[in-house]
């Protein structure tokens, strides 16, 4: 039984709003720390194009990636996922 969802399909379709918030926050924190996409990618051991795709709302990131991003940007996962 799914709580708060009408169907299994609803569970699989992530909110684009959450991706937009994450994209905006990653970009804002990256710029706040004076980091290029490449520098952030290096700190996270990710590819530069992956960071770019997060900032363009093209990726659904894993919890592990969220953790690494938050640590590299000196913030927390909840901060990356909340509107500012």
Predicted regions and their residues:
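Helix-turn-helix DNA-binding elements, focusing on the entry/boundary residues of the two helices
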Residues: 26, 37, 48, 63-66
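N-terminal flexible/basic segments that precede or flank functional cores
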Residues: 1-28, 32-33, 38
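Short alpha-helical DNA-recognition segment
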Residues: 34-53
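DNA major-groove recognition helix of helix-turn-helix/homeodomain DNA-binding modules
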Residues: 64-79
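Short, conserved catalytic or interaction motifs in soluble domains
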Residues: 56-59, 75
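Alpha-helical DNA-recognition elements
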Residues: 53, 57, 68
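Short amphipathic recognition helices of helix-turn-helix/homeodomain-type DNA-binding modules
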Residues: 81-84
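Alpha-helical residues within the helix-turn-helix
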Residues: 31, 42, 71
């Amino acid at each position: 039984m799914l709580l708060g969802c009408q169907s299994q399909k609803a569970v699989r379709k992530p909110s684009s709003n959450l991706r937009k918030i994450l994209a905006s926050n990653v970009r804002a924190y990256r710029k706040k720390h004076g980091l290029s996409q490449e520098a952030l990618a290096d700190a996270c051991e990710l590819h530069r194009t992956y960071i770019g795709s997060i900032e363009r709302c093209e990726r659904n990131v894993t919890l592990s990636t969220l953790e690494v991003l938050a640590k590299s940007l000196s913030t927390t996962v909840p901060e990356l996922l909340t509107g500012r």
